[in-house]
Structure formats: C-alpha cells, structure tokens
Swiss-Prot record:
Component of the cytochrome c oxidase (complex IV, CIV), a multisubunit enzyme composed of 14 subunits. The complex is composed of a catalytic core of 3 subunits MT-CO1, MT-CO2 and MT-CO3, encoded in the mitochondrial DNA, and 11 supernumerary subunits COX4I, COX5A, COX5B, COX6A, COX6B, COX6C, COX7A, COX7B, COX7C, COX8 and NDUFA4, which are encoded in the nuclear genome. Residues 35-40, 106-128, 184-190, 257-261 are mitochondrial intermembrane. This is Cytochrome c oxidase subunit 3. The chain crosses the membrane at residues 16-34, 41-66, 73-105, 129-152, 156-183, 191-223, 233-256. One of its GO terms (cellular component) is mitochondrial inner membrane. Component of the cytochrome c oxidase, the last enzyme in the mitochondrial electron transport chain which drives oxidative phosphorylation. The respiratory chain contains 3 multisubunit complexes succinate dehydrogenase (complex II, CII), ubiquinol-cytochrome c oxidoreductase (cytochrome b-c1 complex, complex III, CIII) and cytochrome c oxidase (complex IV, CIV), that cooperate to transfer electrons derived from NADH and succinate to molecular oxygen, creating an electrochemical gradient over the inner membrane that drives transmembrane transport and the ATP synthase. Pfam families: COX3 (PF00510). Residues 1-15, 67-72, 153-155, 224-232 are mitochondrial matrix. Its EC number is 7.1.1.9. Keywords: Membrane, Mitochondrion, Mitochondrion inner membrane, Translocase, Transmembrane, Transmembrane helix. It is found in: Mitochondrion inner membrane. It catalyses: 4 Fe(II)-[cytochrome c] + O2 + 8 H(+)(in) = 4 Fe(III)-[cytochrome c] + 2 H2O + 4 H(+)(out). Belongs to the cytochrome c oxidase subunit 3 family. It comes from Polypterus ornatipinnis (Ornate bichir).
C-alpha cells in the first residue's frame, strides 16, 4: 500500500467480507441440512471457512493498527462508535428474549396451568450453581478492569496476569453452565419455559465463549507487545463487550433464575 498522508480511515481492498458472506451462507444452510438430513459436511465447511476468515481479517486489522500506524485518533474514534453501535444492537437482540420470557410468565395461559413456572416444571435453585456463576462473572468484571488500569499505568506483568485470570474465570463460567445444562431437570422441548430458558441462557453462554476468545486474542497481543499505555483500543473493545456480557447475566439471573423460579 502507498504511504497514507492523511488521518482518515481508508479501507484497502479485501477478500474477507466475501469469504465471510460465503461462510455465513454455508453455516446457515449447513445447519438446516444437519437438522433434516443428519449430515455435518456443509456445516463443518462453513465453520472452517468462518474461522479462517476471522483469523486472516483480524490479522490484517492488527497489521494496519500496530505495524502500519493507520489507527490514528480519527480512525480510533470511528472504531469506538462502531463498537458502541454493535453493543447497542446486542442489547436489542437480548431484549427479544426477555420480552418472550416476561410475555409468557406475567400472564400464563391455561395451557401452562395458569401458573409460572408451568405445571410439571421443576426450576433450578437460584442459590446454587446460578449464584456461583454470578459471583464468577462479577469477579471477571473486576479482573478485566484491573487489566485496563494496569495497561494504562504501563504495568505489563500485572496486566498479563489479570487478563489471564479473566479468561480462566470465563472458561470456569462456561464449564459450570455446561454442567448445569447436563443436570437440568427440563429440556428445551419442555414448552415455553424450557425454550425461553435455554435460548436466553444459551445465547448468553455463546457470548461468554466469544468474549473469552476476544480476550484470549488480546492476551496474545499483550504478550507480543502490541499494546501501549495509550494505544490499546483492541483491548478496550473486548473489555466493553465483557462488561456487557456481565450486565446481561445479572438481568438473566434476576429475571429467569430468581424471580422466574
């Protein structure tokens, strides 16, 4: 690329939006094929192409921001607005699940026995694994903030340790959630209660896995000296996302586990 003599965000020609779109097509059609014909081939192809696209697209962005110096203050401002809009869209995504839950629980139909939880459903105890999960995610929110402050103060070792701890807490949360799903006394097929419970908590769990991956990428970059005390928006975006995941869990815990039980 020719030397950039201005501060603004000019995107180079890239094949990754096209390969990402093809991967999305393969994933969605592959999911339908898996459900109806029990074949995983198309789904596996879509997943592989999506992973390769993500790795190479992120590699290009890291090169532009870290080695080529293209992430100037106006570009960083645009990236910040982009991340804020993305998180706003995620808020509305989860709003749909809360709407479905409250629509079903505040006025239970005769088919549900006129009560909530519906007749025949044994809800999970909110003061057992769900409470531990809440403590784990809140602790991870503290450690990710510790990472940010350490980065801003130039304390590299502390930042690396705190970020590692955050990722471990995220993985612990995922393991606890998997155990809870395995031992749950109801399934996704158990009416509207099972559906809203597993879809809402399942999508949140997926977001925890995505956030943990995002933070793991930041840990690798931190080890490779990509971040400075004043230039670390990649980590900031991951931290914002992680705090969003924390807040969604608090609403899920209070609504579905505690009030809904």
């Amino acid at each position: 690329m020719a030397h950039q003599a201005h501060a603004y965000h000019m995107v180079d020609p890239s094949p990754w939006p096209l390969t990402g779109a093809v991967a999305a097509l393969l994933l969605t059609s592959g999911l339908a094929v898996w459900f109806h014909f029990k074949s995983l081939t198309l789904l596996a192809m879509g997943l592989l192409l999506m992973i390769l696209t993500m790795i190479q697209w992120w590699r290009d962005i890291i090169r532009e921001g870290t080695f080529q110096g293209h992430h100037t203050p106006p570009v960083q401002k645009g990236l910040r607005y982009g991340m804020i809009l993305f998180i706003t869209s995620e808020v509305f995504f989860f709003l749909g699940f809360f709407w479905a839950f409250y629509h079903s629980s505040l006025a239970p139909t005769p088919e549900l026995g006129g009560i909530w939880p519906p007749t025949g459903i044994t809800p999970l105890d909110p003061f057992e694994v769900p409470l531990l999960n809440t403590a784990v995610l809140l602790a991870s929110g503290v450690t990710v903030t510790w990472t940010h402050h350490s980065l801003m103060e130039g304390k590299r070792t502390e930042a690396t340790q705190a970020l590692t701890l955050t990722i471990l807490l995220g993985l612990y949360f995922t393991a606890l959630q998997a155990m809870e799903y395995y031992e749950a006394p109801f399934t996704i097929a158990d009416g509207v209660y099972g559906t809203t419970f597993f879809v809402a908590t399942g999508f949140h769990g997926l977001h925890v896995i995505i956030g943990s991956t995002f933070l793991a990428g930041c840990l690798l970059r931190q080890i490779l000296y990509h971040f400075t005390s004043s230039h670390h928006f990649g980590f900031e975006a991951a931290a914002w996302y992680w705090h969003f995941v924390d807040v969604v869990w608090l609403f899920l815990y209070v609504s579905i586990y505690w009030w809904g039980s």
